[in-house]
Amino acid sequence: MFGRVAVLLGGTSAEREVSLLSGRNVLEVLRMRGVDAQSVDGVPALAQALVERRFDRVFNVLHGHNGGGEDGVVQGLMQAFGVPYTGSDVLGSALSMDKVRTKQVWLALGLPTPRYASLSVCATAVEVRKAVEMLGFPVIIKPAKEGSSVGVSRVFALEHLEEAVALAARYEGELLMEQLIEGDELTVSILDEMALPSIRIVPQGQWYDYNAKYLAEDTQYVCPGLDDVAEAEIAQLALAAFHSVGCRGWGRVDVMRERGSGRFFLLEVNTAPGMTTHSLVPKAASQLGMGFDDLVWRILEQTL
């Protein structure tokens, strides 16, 4: 049915460890179901493997950019070889990996997203200060092309600004300074053009950082995260956000709901979400009675 399947994992991005966990989980399911599945670690290895091992399709769980699988580079490689693959194509992957350009598309279409300023990694102290004055505290500072909360800081006062900028500047590309929306953090998974039930994330610490996402055992996940009326609203918004940047197949849209007003604000799109025991897409799918094995199968079926 599927032929020989490459499970693309690992790579050299800042999200390598998460990708390895995701890939091993996917690989285990496929092999258990009798699929001839083999792991391939990173983009250079995939280029060689497509020639030597003649894979029929690729299950992409390579996270991040610059050695990852969410920036359009690996999608272009697979298209050049004519090999079907899971997830978004070149355009959708490249655009959604860039948080600044994604926000520009959303704003042009009238979709709600927090106010922001983009900064180069060489931005002067004066430029950084001007951005803060425009947005007002509190702000979030993050690399524009990383995921998994890598390099992200919440800043509430001027004295912590320099440290936050320095942390984000360790990574390639622009920096994104964004208005911090206080309220509930939610995520909506997309599968086969359908929005799955939202998940409201309740970390035990101050916010949903890398530790809360992948290491902590006390982070709470409420699914569905909203009442029926709000669920319908956030589902429509997430699908619009997903399609507006050219995404397809499966993915995840992260959203904040402002405390008090109840307004939704789009944060980012993930085109190759995690598939670990802590990951959110499997949690949302399970709410509909879909186990992890069936979820993996549904995603791979998109390549047929």
Curated annotation (Swiss-Prot):
MF terms in GO: ATP binding; D-alanine-D-alanine ligase activity; metal ion binding
Coiled-coil positions: none
UniProt name for this protein: D-alanine--D-alanine ligase
Record SUPFAM superfamilies: Glutathione synthetase ATP-binding domain-like, PreATP-grasp domain
Catalytically driven reaction(s): 2 D-alanine + ATP = D-alanyl-D-alanine + ADP + phosphate + H(+)
Chain positions recorded as Mg(2+) 1 binding sites: 254, 268
Binding residues annotated for ATP, in chain numbering: 132-187
Ligase keyword on record: yes
Swiss-Prot/TrEMBL keywords: ATP-binding, Cell shape, Cell wall biogenesis/degradation, Cytoplasm, Ligase, Magnesium, Manganese, Metal-binding, Nucleotide-binding, Peptidoglycan synthesis
UniProt superkingdom: Bacteria
First-listed, main subcellular location of the protein, grouped into a coarse class: cytoplasm
Lineage, broadest ranks: Bacteria, Pseudomonadati, Pseudomonadota, Gammaproteobacteria, Lysobacterales
First-level EC class: ligase
Cofactor: Mg(2+); Mn(2+)
Pathway linked to the protein: Cell wall biogenesis; peptidoglycan biosynthesis
Its EC number(s): 6.3.2.4
Cell location: Cytoplasm
Transmembrane segments: none
Keyword Ligase appears in the UniProt entry: yes
Example of a GO cellular component annotation carried by this entry: cytosol
Alphabetical list of PANTHER family matching this protein: D-ALANINE--D-ALANINE LIGASE (PTHR23132), D-ALANINE--D-ALANINE LIGASE B (PTHR23132:SF23)
GO biological process: cell wall organization; peptidoglycan biosynthetic process; regulation of cell shape
